[in-house]
Amino acid sequence: GLFDIVKKVVGTIAGL
């Protein structure tokens, strides 16, 4: 769902 997309974005930022 939409929250999954948000989590993906947060994970990408954390990956930086």
Swiss-Prot record:
Major subcellular site: secreted
Any single Gene Ontology cellular-component annotation: extracellular region
Superkingdom of the organism of origin: Eukaryota
Function description: Antimicrobial activity against B.cereus, L.lactis, L.innocua, M.luteus, S.aureus, S.epidermidis and S.uberis. Probably acts by disturbing membrane functions with its amphipathic structure. Shows anticancer activity. Strongly inhibits the formation of NO by neuronal nitric oxide synthase (nNOS) at micromolar concentrations. Acts by a non-competitive mechanism, probably by binding to calcium/calmodulin and as a consequence blocking calmodulin attachment to nNOS.
Keywords: Amidation, Amphibian defense peptide, Antibiotic, Antimicrobial, Immunity, Innate immunity, Secreted
Expression sites (tissue/organ): Expressed by the skin dorsal glands.
Disulfide bonds: none
Subcellular location: Secreted
Protein name per UniProt: Aurein-2.4
Family affiliation: Belongs to the frog skin active peptide (FSAP) family. Aurein subfamily.
Any GO BP: defense response to bacterium
Record PTM Leucine amide, positions in chain: L16
